[in-house]
C-alpha cells in the first residue's frame, strides 16, 4: 500500500491566524513521524499565508523521514529550494486569491518553463513531482520534461456527490496511474482525501504515496496529532 506524507500546512494556518509562535508546525512534524508518517509535506506559498521560510529551514534539519516541499515554479521559489535542498519537490499552481490549490499544473501549456525548472532542481539531485490533473496530455507532458514523479490531483474524486460520480473519477485516476507508469513516471496523489475516501485511491495500482493534510490536522485538533496520523495509516490500509 502507499506511504503517507502528512501535510502540516494547516498547523501553521492556526499559528498565523494570531501571528504568534504556536502551534509549531515543526513540533507537529515530530509527532506525525513518531506516529508513523512516512514523510512530511509543506507548501511554501508566495504569499506566505501559512508555512514560513524559517519553518522549512528548521524542518530540513529535523525531519527524519523525507521532506517534500510544495512550491510554485517561480524564480523566487527555485532559489529557495536550491538553498534548502528538500528531499523532493512538488511543483504546484498558485493563485493568491485561492483558498487552497484549485487544480493541477498546466505542464503541456508551459513546457519550456516547466522543463527549465525541473532541470534546475533535478540538476542538483532534487527529484521533482508535477501536481497535475489525471489527464493524458498533462501526464505525457510531465514525462516529456523528464520529471521523476507526478502527483495526481484527487479533488474531483474527493468532491464527488454520489457513488456513480465517485466511481467515474476513480476510474479516471486509475487510468492516469497506468498512463504514468507506462511513461516511466512514479505516481503519488493528494487533495481532498479523507479517512472515509482514501482507501480506494490507496488501492490503485502503482500508487506510491498519498499526501494528506487538512483532514489529519482537523482530527488532530480533537484527538491529537499522533492518533490522527495512526488512524490515517489504518485508513490507507482499509483497517479504519
UniProtKB/Swiss-Prot annotation:
It is found in: Cytoplasm. SUPFAM superfamilies: Pyridoxine 5'-phosphate synthase (SSF63892). The record marks 151 as: Transition state stabilizer. GO terms for cellular component: cytosol. It catalyses: 3-amino-2-oxopropyl phosphate + 1-deoxy-D-xylulose 5-phosphate = pyridoxine 5'-phosphate + phosphate + 2 H2O + H(+). Its EC number is 2.6.99.2. Pathway: Cofactor biosynthesis; pyridoxine 5'-phosphate biosynthesis; pyridoxine 5'-phosphate from D-erythrose 4-phosphate: step 5/5. It comes from the Bacteria. 3-amino-2-oxopropyl phosphate binds at residues 7, 18, 192, 213-214. CDD domains: PNPsynthase. Homooctamer; tetramer of dimers. NCBIfam families: pdxJ, PRK05265.1-1, PRK05265.1-3, PRK05265.1-5. Catalyzes the complicated ring closure reaction between the two acyclic compounds 1-deoxy-D-xylulose-5-phosphate (DXP) and 3-amino-2-oxopropyl phosphate (1-amino-acetone-3-phosphate or AAP) to form pyridoxine 5'-phosphate (PNP) and inorganic phosphate. This is Pyridoxine 5'-phosphate synthase. It comes from Trichodesmium erythraeum (strain IMS101). The lineage of its organism: Bacteria, Bacillati, Cyanobacteriota, Cyanophyceae, Oscillatoriophycideae. The gene is pdxJ.
Amino acid at each position: 500500500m502507499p506511504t503517507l506524507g502528512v501535510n502540516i500546512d494547516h498547523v501553521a494556518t492556526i499559528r498565523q491566524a494570531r501571528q504568534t509562535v504556536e502551534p509549531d508546525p515543526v513540533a507537529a512534524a515530530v509527532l506525525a513521524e513518531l506516529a508513523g508518517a512516512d514523510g512530511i509535506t509543506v507548501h511554501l506559498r508566495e504569499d506566505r499565508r501559512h508555512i514560513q521560510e524559517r519553518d522549512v529551514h528548521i524542518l530540513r534539519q529535523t525531519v527524519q523521514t523525507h521532506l517534500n516541499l510544495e512550491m510554485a515554479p517561480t524564480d523566487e521559489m527555485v532559489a529557495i529550494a536550491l538553498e534548502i535542498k528538500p528531499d523532493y519537490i512538488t511543483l504546484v499552481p498558485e493563485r493568491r486569491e485561492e483558498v487552497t490549490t484549485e487544480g493541477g499544473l498546466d505542464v503541456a501549456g508551459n513546457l519550456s518553463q516547466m522543463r527549465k525548472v525541473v532541470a534546475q532542481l533535478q540538476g542538483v539531485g532534487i527529484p521533482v513531482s508535477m501536481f497535475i490533473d489525471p489527464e493524458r496530455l498533462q501526464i505525457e507532458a510531465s514525462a516529456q520534461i523528464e520529471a521523476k514523479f507526478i502527483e495526481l490531483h484527487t479533488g474531483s474524486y474527493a468532491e464527488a456527490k454520489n457513488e456513480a460520480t465517485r466511481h467515474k473519477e476513480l476510474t479516471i485516476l486509475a487510468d492516469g496511474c497506468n498512463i504514468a507508469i507506462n511513461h516511466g513516471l512514479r505516481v503519488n496523489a493528494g487533495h481532498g482525501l479523507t479517512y472515509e475516501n482514501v482507501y480506494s485511491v490507496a488501492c490503485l495500482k502503482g500508487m506510491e504515496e498519498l499526501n494528506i493534510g487538512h483532514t489529519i490536522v482537523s482530527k488532530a485538533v480533537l484527538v491529537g496529532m499522533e492518533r490522527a496520523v495512526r488512524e490515517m495509516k489504518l485508513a490507507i490500509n482499509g483497517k479504519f
